[in-house]
């Protein structure tokens, strides 16, 4: 773990419980990121916060640190049973909930605090057994948490700390009714420590904070550039007919160590996967209907390097911790300009450089003006030579059905090393759009 830091604020100087500091130091965390340096003093004073911060800024560590410190320095409610959670952390996706849990476990290893997961797509009985063994911090998605609540596995009467992560995404996915259902079954806002984090503090997010929090202080960490100064952005204008050949040619020209390819629909992702798998690439597919265990396996393979390319819908764009992504390909420009930022933000993290390549095709070029207005700069444009594109592409493999998702990761084939020697260079001299 790198010993660099962004601020001069040390965790040890914040007045945290010694057990919390010990857990942080064991993981190599000594100095705060900006969101941590701003949020933790407020939270340690007992004040609620509504924080605006992008993924990758350290917000997860901020709310985990505050939650654990609050539980260690505050007495549990009298008469509380071990199966009744004292803190609840709500996330919009299963993957994000799992990541938060994995980040939490080493921090509480020596504190006696027990964490448990609750999310759909996984064994109900396994999660139930964990909860019945005792839980202090419940981490999960709202649907499964409500399922357990309605089954009277636990109640929410003893909640002393609440975290709502990626609140804007909760709205996007239609979970806001679930959130309100849970909030209304907890102690009053002034009787608990409340933390809300969101990429944007839109009117609807602020309204939610006003409704279910106690006079929250707004903490905002704006990136210097929405897209990050370490990310090299590049834009092509391919015809629909050239898109797949251009993608394959650029992959072999760039030869990325680890790349994510985003498309706007499940159908398009499956088509891209089928072409890349047929060409011998080690490629995984991540869409919304991939079974949970398979999703976890694909992400593990991608993280460990046995899969080089991940084709995904925006389910993978936010919340997931995937280190060392070198390239992001926007096969389709997203319909939501914020999703462009979240997509390319998967690369260029933790001080590393990254490369984002986007296709403004016949179907999605219409989204480009809104994206460039949002990121406040034009994306450098490159031309390509159609005659330099790979022409001998094999026919795509048959796309597996949903019941055969485990076959969607082709890890056995070699990468297309024979084509790399062709040294194709489809790019023409760069043409930069006028600002």
UniProtKB/Swiss-Prot annotation:
SUPFAM superfamilies: P-loop containing nucleoside triphosphate hydrolases
Gene Ontology MF terms in the entry: ATP binding; ATP hydrolysis activity; RNA binding; RNA helicase activity
Residue stretches making up the Helicase C-terminal domain: 245-390
Primary subcellular site in the record, as a coarse category: cytoplasm
Record SMART domains: DEXDc, HELICc
Subcellular location, record wording: Cytoplasm
Entry's Gene Ontology BP terms: RNA catabolic process
Protein residues bound to ATP: 53-60
Renumbered ranges of motif Q motif: 9-37
Chain intervals for the UniProt region annotation (Disordered): 395-435
Motif (DEAD box): 165-168
Extent of Polar residues compositional bias: 401-413
Quaternary structure and partners: Component of the RNA degradosome, which is a multiprotein complex involved in RNA processing and mRNA degradation.
Family per similarity comment: Belongs to the DEAD box helicase family. RhlB subfamily.
Protein name: ATP-dependent RNA helicase RhlB
Source organism (scientific name): Vibrio vulnificus (strain YJ016)
Taxonomic lineage: Bacteria, Pseudomonadati, Pseudomonadota, Gammaproteobacteria, Vibrionales
């Amino acid at each position: 773990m790198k010993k660099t830091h962004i601020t001069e604020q040390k965790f040890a100087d914040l007045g945290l419980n010694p057990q919390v500091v010990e857990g942080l130091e064991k993981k190599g965390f000594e100095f705060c990121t900006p969101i941590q340096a701003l949020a933790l003093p407020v939270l340690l004073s007992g004040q609620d916060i509504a924080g605006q911060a992008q993924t990758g800024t350290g917000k997860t560590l901020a709310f985990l640190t505050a939650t654990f410190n609050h539980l260690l320095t505050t007495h549990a409610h009298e008469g509380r049973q071990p199966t009744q959670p004292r803190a609840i952390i709500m996330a919009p996706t299963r993957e994000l909930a799992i990541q938060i849990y994995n980040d939490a476990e080493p921090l509480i290893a020596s504190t006696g605090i027990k964490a448990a997961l609750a999310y759909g797509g996984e064994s109900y009985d396994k999660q139930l057994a964990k909860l019945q063994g005792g839980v202090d911090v419940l981490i999960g998605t709202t649907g499964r948490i409500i399922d357990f609540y309605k089954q009277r596995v636990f109640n929410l009467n003893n909640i002393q700390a609440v975290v709502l992560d990626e609140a804007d995404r909760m709205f996007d996915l239609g979970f806001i009714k679930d959130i309100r259902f849970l909030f209304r079954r907890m102690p009053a806002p002034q009787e608990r420590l409340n933390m809300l984090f969101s990429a944007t503090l839109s009117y609807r997010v602020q309204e939610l904070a006003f409704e279910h929090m106690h006079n929250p202080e707004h903490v905002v960490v704006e990136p210097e550039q929405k897209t990050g100064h370490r990310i090299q952005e590049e834009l092509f204008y391919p015809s629909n007919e050239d898109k797949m050949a251009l993608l394959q040619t650029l992959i072999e020209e760039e030869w990325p160590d680890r790349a994510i390819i985003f498309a706007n629909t499940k159908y398009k992702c499956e088509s891209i996967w089928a072409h890349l798998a047929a060409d011998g690439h080690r490629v995984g597919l991540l869409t919304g209907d991939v079974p949970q265990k398979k999703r976890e396996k694909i992400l593990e393979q991608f993280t460990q390097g046995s899969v080089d390319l991940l084709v995904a819908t925006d389910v993978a764009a936010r919340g997931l911790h995937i280190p060392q992504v070198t390239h992001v390909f926007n096969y389709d420009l997203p319909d939501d300009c914020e999703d462009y930022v979240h997509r390319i933000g998967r690369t260029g993290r933790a001080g590393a450089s990254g490369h984002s390549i986007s296709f403004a095709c016949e179907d999605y070029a219409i989204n480009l003006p809104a994206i460039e207005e949002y990121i406040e700069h034009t994306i450098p444009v490159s031309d390509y030579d159609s005659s330099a594109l790979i022409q001998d592409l094999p026919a795509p493999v048959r796309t597996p059905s949903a019941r055969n998702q485990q076959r969607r990761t082709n890890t056995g084939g070699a990468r297309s090393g024979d084509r790399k020697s062709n040294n194709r260079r489809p790019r023409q001299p760069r043409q930069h759009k006028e600002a």
